[in-house]
Structures are given as C-alpha cells and as structure tokens.
Design a protein with these regions (language model features):
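Active-site rim beta-loop-alpha module in soluble metabolic enzymes
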Residues: 165
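Adenine-nucleotide cofactor-binding loop residues
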Residues: 168
Length: 182
C-alpha cells in the first residue's frame, strides 16, 4: 500500500489504537511489535528478526509476551471484536494455537491465540531453518482450527478478516466503520 498501515486512521484513531482499544476489553496488556510505533500509551517491542516477514513479527510478539498465552492481531484487521477473541479463548484447552478460518477457507494466523512456550520454541527453530510462513508454525504445533461456520453468527463476523492492502480497501473500511456506528 506504500504507507504504514498501523497509522491509518479509522474513527479518528490509528488502526493500532482501534485494535488495542478492543483488546483492552479482555486484557490489561497490549504490546505493539515493530518499528516507528507512535502510539505512546502502548508497550512496544522490536522484532528479534527484522525484515523476516509475518513469522518474524509473530516471533517478536511471542518473545515480548509475559503471559502463558498471546492474542496476536495484524494491524490491518480493524474489525476484530471482543466476541471473536472470547470464542477463541474458550477453545484453547489442550491446544498450542487457536486459529480462525476465514470465509475463503484460508487460516488467519495473524488473528489468533498462541501458547507462548511451545510456539516461541517452534517459531525460533523455523526461522533458523529459513522458514518465513506462519502456517509452518501452525502445522508444527497442536492447532485448533476454528471454522468460519463456528464464528459466523458472532456480531460483525463478515468483517473480521477484511484486511487493508490497497487505498481502495482503506476507503471501503472507512465507509464500513461509519456504517457500523449508525
């Protein structure tokens, strides 16, 4: 898209602030992983493996987490809700990750729950082997795949995985956010 998506505005706040506000309803700690983070009220962690793509960012999030589990959300998924994460949290017993499946049947590893210890160990090993895909991590640990049919009845479920990759996507997100407010 040519710009830092985390700082795009939706409802007069950055995507990062918007997502953090949602997460603060279910946790008291939100950490942003990356460079040039301007949201001063949030804890910031740097990538351990800079420029290693999504798996590197995921590793940075897991490495920075001080709890048993981490909720990981990409900065370009501004329509996630508390209800989605509450449902995912109910599914974690006996698993290392809980990952929703999008309507197009693809997993969404950047909107998921991760048990820190096993996932960090596997993410480190995968990176050291030259791997870059979060899906490699999900296949290496005990993953609970949550089908879209299990979450489709949640409020706003059709919007959860609308990520912002183009200026047109951003324009549509602004319109959708305005429509959801009314």
């Amino acid at each position: 898209m040519g710009t830092d998506k985390s700082q795009l505005l939706i409802e007069q706040e950055s995507f990062t602030q918007h997502i953090a506000k949602t997460l603060f309803n279910i946790t008291n700690s939100v950490t942003v992983v990356g460079r040039n983070v301007d949201d001063s009220n949030l804890r910031v962690a740097m990538d351990v493996y800079p420029r290693w793509g999504a798996l590197g960012g995921l590793h940075g999030a897991l490495n920075a987490c001080q709890r048993e589990w981490a909720i990981v959300v990409a900065c370009d998924l501004p329509f996630v809700t508390i209800e989605l994460f509450e449902l995912l949290m109910k599914e974690r017993a006996g698993y290392d990750t809980v990952v929703p499946i999008q309507p197009d049947q693809r997993p969404q590893p950047l909107c998921a729950l991760y048990r820190i210890r096993p996932c960090l160990e596997h993410a480190t090993a995968l990176i050291e082997m030259g791997k870059r895909r979060p899906l490699d991590l999900l296949e290496a640990v005990n993953t609970r795949w949550v089908s879209f049919s299990e979450i489709e009845d949640l409020p706003q479920a059709q919007n959860f995985f609308l990520n912002i990759n183009t200026p047109a996507d951003y324009y549509e997100a602004i319109k959708k956010a305005a429509a959801l407010k009314t």
